[in-house]
Amino acid sequence: MSLIPHDLGRQGEDAAASWLLCKGYRIIRRNYRYRRNEIDIIAMDDRTLCFVEVKTRATIDKGHPLEAVTPQKQKEIIRTARAFLCMEYHEEIDCRFDVVAIIAKGYEKGRLKEFDVEHITDAFWAE
């Protein structure tokens, strides 16, 4: 059984958040929206604030999930991160942009059960 893209994406974000928690990250916010853009996960890794984009794919037949984080998408994430920092986080802090790729390997009763995770820290930088 396959999932519709929205469900797959949501479950991929849940899997990424759980994976980050297991790695010692502290989740600050999920699905932070600014205007029409969104950051999937905002988390602390020790003393670094991480803005995490999650891309989930059922297969890699049409490309690896990391390929979907285009330069345009990076600009949108950076703009949204700046808005978050200005409006909601009023102290100086080290920041970085990460990408988590989730590739589905198995489903059970419509739920993502098996998957591969690839986490790229410092995947891109704000200029």
UniProtKB/Swiss-Prot annotation:
Q: Which Gene3D superfamilies match?
A: 3.40.1350.10
Any one GO MF term held by the record is: nucleic acid binding
Q: Name the domain of life.
A: Bacteria
Which SUPFAM superfamilies does the protein's record reference?
Answer: Restriction endonuclease-like
Q: Which family does it belong to?
A: Belongs to the UPF0102 family.
Name-wise, this protein is UPF0102 protein Paes_0016
Species this chain originates from: Prosthecochloris aestuarii (strain DSM 271 / SK 413)
